[in-house]
C-alpha cells in the first residue's frame, strides 16, 4: 500500500499500534484504491494518549514562550523542506489536486508554526494594574490537556492550526483526524518530534464517531477544539458543557457572496469560483449563495459558464488538474442528491450537474455545477452541501440582499464585490458572519482571526486571538502595606 504509516497512532513520541481497534481503510479518492490500513483507538489507546499529554504538559508550561517558539519554528522549516512529499500525501489522503495542496495545505500549516512560534512572547503578555500603593497583575496560563478533532478537507492544515496555538500557550494536545483522512496528522506529529518537541505533547490517535466521546468526556481534558459539521458541533459542545470544558467550534456555513452591478465582473466570477470549486467545493467558508444584482446577471452567468466548463477534471497528482474527486463515495452521493433536488425544485442548471466521463469510474468525481434562478426557499440555498455546487440568486437593491443574506442559521463567512468601498464597508458591517471579504474570497492567512457566529460556531482560529482560547487569565493582587481588618 503506497501510503501505509509505521503504525496507526503517534503517542509519547513514538508510533503505537493496537490491532484490537476497528479497521480504518484509507482510500485514494481518485481510484478507490486502499492506500493504507489503520486501526481506530481503543479505550486503552485513548487513556495512553491522554496520560502522556498530562504527564508532559507541566514541564512544557514551565518553559519560556521563546523556548517553545524555537521548536515550532524548526517544525515550520522542516515542513517547508518537505513540502512536496507532504503535499503528495495530502493529495492521496483527500483527492485534492496537487496544484492546490502544494501551495495551500502544508504551507499554511508551516505558516501557523512560524507565526505562533514568533509572536507568542508578545501575545501571551499580561497587564499591570496600579491600585494606589497596591497593585495587581494578570498573566496568561495554559489550560492543560487539549483535544483537537479535525475535519477531512484540510487535514494537515487543521492539525497545525490547532497544535500551534495550543502548544505555544503551554498546553499538550491529543489530536484525532477524520477517519476519511488519517495520514497527514501522523506526519505532523513526526515532524514536531523531530524539531525537538518533548514526548507526549502532541499525540495523534485514529478513530471514528465512537472515539470522539471518549476524548470529549475525559475528566483530564480541559479544552476541545472541533472543526466539523453543525450537528457534530452541537453534540461535542453539549458533552463538553457537562464538564465545563473550554471549547472552540469551527463549523459549517451557507455563506453569501454578494456581487453588485459596479463590480469588476471577471474578479467577481473568479471569486465565486474560488468560493465554490476550490478543494472540489469542500470548504466550510464557501460562498455558496451567490447573490448577483439583476442588471449584470446575464453577463455574469455567461462568463461563469464558460470558465466553469473549461476547468480541467482529472488525476489529482497531475499538476494540470484543477478539479479532483470528492473525498469519499458517500460524500459524492450526498452531493449528487442535492443536485437532483435542485433540478426537481426548479433551479436552472447552467453548468455541470453530472459525473465526468473522462476519469476513472472508480473515483469519486463530480462536475462543478452552477444553478441559476435559485430562490431562498430551495433546499440547495438553505442547506450546506459541501461540494462543488453554486447557487446563483438575483437581487434588486442593497437592503433586500442584506436581509436575504442574513436569513440563515449559519454565520461563518461572507463576501462583497463592488467598486464602491463605502458601500462595501456598510454592507459587511450589517452581514451576520464572523469572517468577511471585500473584493476577495476564501483567503485565510494565519495572521487574521478565522471563525463564525450563529450556528457556525464560536471561538477563533489563528492570529493572536487564538491564544485567548488556549489560555486563561490569572489575576494576582499584591498588597504593599499592612492589612486593615475591622475585627
From Swiss-Prot:
UniProt cross-references to SUPFAM superfamilies, sorted A to Z: ALDH-like
Active-site residues from the entry: 162 (charge relay system), 250 (proton acceptor), 284 (nucleophile), 461 (charge relay system)
Top enzyme category: oxidoreductase
Protein's name according to its UniProt entry: Betaine aldehyde dehydrogenase
Entry's Gene Ontology BP terms: glycine betaine biosynthetic process from choline
Pfam family, one: Aldedh
NCBIfam families xrefs: BADH, PRK13252.1
Subunit: Dimer of dimers.
General function of this protein: Involved in the biosynthesis of the osmoprotectant glycine betaine. Catalyzes the irreversible oxidation of betaine aldehyde to the corresponding acid.
Amino acids binding K(+) 1: 26, 93
Species lineage: Bacteria, Pseudomonadati, Pseudomonadota, Alphaproteobacteria, Hyphomicrobiales
Binding site for NAD(+): 150-152, 176-179, 229-232, 252, 284, 384
Protein's organism: Rhizobium leguminosarum bv. trifolii (strain WSM2304)
EC number, UniProt record: 1.2.1.8
The record's free-text note on cofactor binding: Binds 2 potassium ions per subunit.
